[in-house]
């Protein structure tokens, strides 16, 4: 039986309407949903009495920081910012939080404590990928962090996905708003600038996996991407601190023409470390072709789980308190890349998921140590 369709205008506005009324349900367990009243601290974590320590649960407190962790953070290059992909994980008890908190509490109130961790100087706002956020939501994020904290924000997929998708993620039809400059301005760039201000660090345009139809028309794809990035950069003239990065999910796009577009528009390539893309050493040539320039990297998933292994990784890594899938190969090469780029005065933003190795804060600490080791071994720039 064919699905019913509503008559809506044939322009990009209907795509945004469809996205907000349908695609937003794709992530049904969105921990950041605004349905939780601002004054509700959520339920206590497992093992806590319902009325215990209510005052403490009203605001999430940071875990005490060992002196060696402070020393490690101080020794890192000032140009380097590392952080996680979201922060609402009770398993970070003792690492980031001072005790056991429910995930809903951390989602609402944990960012302030997260931002006090000396190694966590940025965060990736993944939520914005699933639906556009409002200025007030970005203002709330900024208000929970110190002035020196920076945000990496993902563009809504209504702009970066070539397909309009059903709730199960399957493509239903072509997306007429794909890489639309006007929609990107109103639904992404303007709200982030207004809400985050000087704390906006990186705008990430993650292109969802493309159909073969698009992959066989790279010239048209890159022309559309260049038009989008040119428009975005025109809105950032007064915000030179903002880096624009493009992440792809198709290895076929790692070609010189892609680098030409990035170079022409002042954007950079976002290293995407997961099973859908080649290992880091096979992505670095494209990044090198853009030198000099900043580094943006999202270390999302250990390659041992394959291209579609997020669910398996979640099961293997929960509750995300320990390193369970160490990846020294990726860590070492990433550390060398960070050391080389920051050692020459360029900025580096690196966000790490729990699914990279099992626990993002521990992965970041290990990466920090590897960066210092790589910097000590690297020849000094002259």
Model segments located where?
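Residues lining hydrophobic/aromatic ligand-binding pockets adjacent to catalytic sites
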Residues: 12-382
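Extreme N-terminal basic, low-complexity initiation segments
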Residues: 2-10
């Amino acid at each position: 039986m064919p699905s019913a369709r509503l008559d809506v205008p044939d322009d990009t506005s209907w795509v945004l309407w469809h996205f907000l009324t349908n695609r937003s349900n794709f992530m049904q367990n969105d921990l950041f949903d605004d349905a939780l009243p601002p004054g509700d601290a959520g339920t206590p974590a497992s093992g806590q009495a319902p009325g215990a320590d209510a005052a403490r649960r009203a605001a999430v407190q940071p875990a005490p920081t060992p002196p060696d962790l402070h020393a490690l953070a101080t020794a890192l290059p000032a140009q380097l910012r590392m952080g996680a992909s979201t922060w609402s994980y009770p398993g970070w008890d003792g690492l980031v939080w001072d005790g056991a908190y429910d995930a809903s509490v951390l989602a609402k109130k944990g960012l302030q404590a997260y931002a006090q961790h000396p190694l966590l100087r940025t965060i990736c706002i993944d939520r914005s990928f699933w639906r556009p956020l409002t200025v007030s939501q970005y203002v709330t994020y900024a208000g929970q962090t110190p002035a020196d904290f920076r945000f990496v924000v993902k563009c809504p997929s209504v702009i970066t996905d070539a397909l309009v998708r059903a709730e199960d993620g399957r493509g239903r039809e072509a997306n007429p708003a794909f890489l639309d400059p006007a929609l990107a301005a109103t639904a992404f760039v303007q709200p982030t600038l207004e809400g985050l201000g000087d704390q906006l660090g990186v705008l990430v345009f993650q292109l969802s996996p493309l159909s073969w139809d698009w992959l066989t028309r790279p010239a048209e794809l890159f022309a559309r991407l260049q038009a989008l990035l040119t428009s975005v950069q025109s809105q950032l003239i007064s915000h030179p601190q903002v880096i624009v990065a493009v992440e792809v999910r198709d290895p076929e796009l790692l070609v010189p023409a892609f680098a030409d577009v990035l170079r022409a528009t002042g954007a950079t390539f976002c290293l995407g470390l997961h099973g859908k893309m080649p290992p880091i050493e096979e992505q670095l040539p494209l990044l090198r072709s853009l030198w000099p320039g900043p580094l943006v990297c999202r270390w999302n998933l250990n390659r041992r789980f394959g291209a579609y292994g997020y669910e398996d990784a979640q099961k293997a890594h929960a509750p995300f308190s320990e390193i369970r899938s160490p990846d020294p190969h990726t860590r070492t090469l990433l550390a060398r890349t960070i050391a080389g780029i920051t050692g020459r005065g360029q900025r580096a933003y690196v966000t790490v998921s729990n699914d990279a190795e099992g626990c993002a804060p521990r992965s970041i600490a290990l990466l920090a140590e590897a960066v210092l080791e790589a910097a000590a071994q690297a020849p000094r720039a002259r």
